[in-house]
Amino acid sequence: MFRYFCSNRFSLSITISTRDLVKRYHSRTVVNHVSIEVNQGEIVGLLGPNGAGKTTTFYQVVGLIKPDEGDVFLNEENITALPMYKRARMGIGYLPQEASVFRKLSVENNIAAVLEMSDLTKAEQKEKLETLLDEFRLHHVRKSNGDLLSGGERRRTEIARALAVDPKFILLDEPFAGIDPIAVEDIQAIVAKLKYKNIGILITDHNVTETLSICDRAYLLIEGKIFKQGTAEELAEDEQVRKLYLGRNFELKRKDWLHEEARSEVGIPLENMIASVENALAWNEKIIEANTQGERAFGHQYISADTKIADLGLDDYSKFLLELKQSLITYGKQNKNAEILNRADKFLTDNGDINTDLNTILLFLKSEQR
């Protein structure tokens, strides 16, 4: 019987991590042995009161500040000494709090300027420009200069421009600062969508309500050390966290950004849906390989195929498949594709082979491209 292998050690995703970061200013230690990690396809918050060390930690991940001790890694590659532009070439995008659009360039030229540095042909650059303008609802301001944009339009332009080079991670510094409440929801929906592009997001922001509401996980820094880490719910329910940071009356306002509402607003591009299914197939191949090498080689327990995927908790593989199923259902509804919807609805619910199901779904998705 084919068996599935689930382990946090076993993943195709890329990870940014820090190990024991330390930063001192004169005799004061502002970051004290801080270790965090961000995986592709998740949203992580870096939170804390003023003076807690969160901004200094964030800037060490970005490459703006060099740590006195500790290291920053992209997977197992040490990137601590690399300048920002080299980190960007490795797929680490950064959006500062301050406006970063070229003020005297139009929206389309802001994006085109970045596309010109890519390996795409002129035709491909033009196609990608139109895709980004459409995806971020910027067509109506495409000819407007950067200094004429609203706060929300500016943020959407900055994120669209960052995506022009297909980053693996985006580091967001105060993304909700200086924009109105409607624009905040707009940016939240966009950040949620980035997760479904398999982009890892690290956010630091003083607006804790807006930030926690979209985070999968968060780190809370107090006096330069990690005081608490966990899901947004775990932080919100912790009495000490409430006492020291959130306040007694704090209420976590979760919105299902990742399902019907946000995805019906921003849509799921066909190419992203295809990429997700292909990623699942590649992951499955690795699982089969792990299974043939035997339990001894990995030191982990195997899970039989007749175990329900829903019973596998938060293991990376099962979580990815469950989210993929929901994405497929949403895509089928959006595009009124009964066949995709039917296949997605049955996915993970019967005794069918996952590899066969994924290949069948992939064929239907690719037929949409023709």
What are these regions, as identified by a protein language model?
Residues 47-49:
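The feature captures the beta-strand-to-loop junction immediately N-terminal to the Walker
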Residues 145-149, 153:
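Conserved ABC ATPase signature
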Residues 166:
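Conserved catalytic motifs of ABC-family nucleotide-binding domains
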Residues 123-141, 189-192, 240:
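Conserved ABC ATPase "signature" region
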Residues 170-174:
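Catalytic Walker B motif of ABC-type/P-loop ATPase nucleotide-binding domains
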Residues 62:
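Helix-to-loop junction immediately C-terminal to a conserved catalytic motif
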